[in-house]
């Protein structure tokens, strides 16, 4: 997998991700200005609730569907797509039932009253839409329709924003829940239309029950993985609400959203193009080479953005939320380092999902989710809100070490020395840039290290492309 292809995919998915994230931050900005940090905390909790149910009822279809379709022979691909569609409808119905059954007890368990029960019920209606979207996205992704997927994401984000903003302004907290529903239902409908247009010939294909059973078996493991992650997020937010209040949850949500947003297009590109490619790799050596190239490209793409998080964090909080969100800055700084670690570990995580044994996937993800939930819950009661961000970085590092060990054993090889040197050098540069920016009085001074890192990464990318072209010429 060439650097050029990775960067083209990143440009497509990155452009879409920028629009999606801009829409999300505009919505968060409106909530912060109208309802304050408590409103931001509420939208974070509502999203965690609907995401937790979606992860459980979705049964890992968004990932298992890609793996099954991408790895199938061309003659069998239509049958696999038909199976993903059929299972997607069934799981969407299951998700709707689960959301409607659970929103009331979860409301009481969290808020000790039914004050936000209506809002939670509306947020539950987003669950089947999210599950359906995962099925249609899997079809487009595995079929290589990256540009179609990007266009759909842009249209869905803009439409959901235009419909959701008036609801927030008019109905307050109920409008927040409605905006979550609109942000889910619009993309689901558009993705459904795009999937039908991209693969019209599967409409009359008979669904094989063996394919359904395999998707259920594989998806069961992936569901456990996704659900553990969502449950971990929900438990952490619940602990923050209990011990630090809704305002504390709002600061955590602001830092979490910003830290995951700027490098988000790198992760989106990994899921859109890298995952189906590593799933279809002919052997472990080929998969290892694809993974190493992805990590190198991810570091070059993501390093300037992590530098922006570290050097321009305060400015980001003021622009995207409000000047009253300065309490989120220490959390953002810690989370930025967790994101840097994930630039290297996420490709390994995708490799594990694509090629790892089911039991290994469940074991490693369970360990990661357990640490990600228990560590912040324990630390918050002793060291306050910032410990939740510290725990985020620690859990990212622990998970990375664990999956790296599995990768080394299963692939019977390791990455080249160049990758290790590049990673440590980038970490040192980022730390120096953060230290320099912290000593400046002007909020915009952080643009200097960001620009320098961006220039260095651009030069490194051009060097990698020239070296790849030279190797091809020699062959």
Where are these regions (language model features)?
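Helix-loop junctions and terminal segments of transmembrane helices
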Residues: 58-74, 142, 255, 259-299, ...
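Alpha-helical transmembrane segments of polytopic membrane transporters and translocases
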Residues: 29-30, 41-58, 221, 236-239, ...
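Membrane-water interface segments that mark the loop-to-transmembrane alpha-helix transition
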Residues: 8-20, 24, 46, 55-107, ...
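Transmembrane alpha-helical segments of multi-pass transport proteins
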Residues: 22, 121, 368, 417-470, ...
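Hydrophobic alpha-helical transmembrane segments
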Residues: 117-124, 150-199, 256, 366-374, ...
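N-terminal membrane topogenesis motif
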Residues: 1-24, 78-82, 115-117, 206-225, ...
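Interfacial segments at transmembrane-helix termini and the short loops linking adjacent helices
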Residues: 106-123, 292, 309-343, 347, ...
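Interhelical loop/hinge segments that connect adjacent transmembrane helices in multipass membrane
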Residues: 1-6, 180, 191-233, 273-289, ...
